[in-house]
Amino acid sequence: MKTMKQNNKNMKLQAMIMAAALTTAVSVQAQNGKYISKVYDFRPAPGQFVNEIPEWEEGDTEAGMIAKAEEQISGGTDNGMISLGGFGGYVVFGFDHRVVNVSGQSDFMVYGNAVYDLVDANYASSEPGIVMVSVDANGNGLPDDEWFELAGSDYNAANTYHGYQITYEKPDPGRATAADPDADDSAIIAKTYIKWTTNSEAEPEGYVKRNSFHTTNSYWPAWISDEKMTFEGTRLECLTVNIAATGLRYVATPRAWGYVDDLPNSANKGYDIGWAVDADGNAVNLPAIDFVKVYTAVNHEHGWIGEISTEICGAEDLHPTASVTEIESDGGIKIAGCEGMVKVQGAREVSVYTLGGALAARFEGDGEAALTPALYVVRADSRVAMVQVR
């Protein structure tokens, strides 16, 4: 079910980065902040905790709700929490520095609120979110460049749907709260509350249901006036089951690794930038990233518990003192990002590009180029590397 997308954005630059077969050494520099410093976007899909976590108040705008989300999840991991609603709802955030891809290690952690089942620890309150990362390729400080999914344990699972698309329709504000109760589940007071349609032939349409535990808030983000919201991404299979002999007791089997709010934080080892893949599933070599996006990855309702909705409590850079610095290839070419410059030894011709693809410097033989602090792509003969100028 994987869709094949034509990606024509920064194709030359991406080809250079993906061709890199160099080993990155990690050095230590001044202490960076460990936790989220900025939330760039917050757009939850409809859900029972929308307008509650964080709380929407009369007059709050989109910018105001983004600021509230930032207040909840920045600066630590226990300041608060946000809910992303149903499938596709997302948040985009960053740190006060680039997060470095340290080879063979988890690079950052995103904290959720999943817990193991009190009776059977094989199950948990899993509501998985997919993680994506991006590099500020155009250098404008905004998350408007290409996104790469971190391929978790279920990326290639048989029932994973790549290119899943869902559209939610805004509910009639005049509709009665308990307009359409579910005769089979007394907790559902409106089983046809918010309609959605998808591109899945197996489940082309359905509803976000209103339950009796959240009756005063709208499940539609109050600061979004659009009549429809569309999200697209990778949909994971719902692993929630009812294990009660009688009645309803919903639990889920957590995935092995790679998803937010799926395993409890104590069992989650974090996220490796080395898992990044492009839209076609090809591995991408990203020595560092600037932005992180998390979105709810399952579209499912489970009775009185409500829709599966990823919750986030914060994120942490697991090695904030790391930086992309010196690289040495098997061919003996040395490339180093230094204070205010790039240095290269052992190459005949050297070209240095910005992440936006513009030529920043060119020289022959051993040499150096004075540059402003940023990440650069360096081509030294047939060798390609991304380095950081401090």
Outline where the language-model segments fall.
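C-terminal outer-membrane/trafficking sorting elements
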Residues: 325-390
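Sec/Tat signal peptide C-region and signal peptidase I cleavage site
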Residues: 26-30
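Tryptophan-centered short beta-strand motifs
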Residues: 142-150
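Bacterial N-terminal signal peptides that target proteins for export
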Residues: 3-17
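Short loop/turn segments immediately following beta-strands, especially the blade-tip
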Residues: 134-140
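Residue-level detector of buried hydrophobic side-chain packing
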Residues: 95, 131-133, 357
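Bacterial N-terminal signal peptides
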Residues: 15-25
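A domain-level signal for the mature, folded cores of soluble proteins
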Residues: 31-127, 152-321
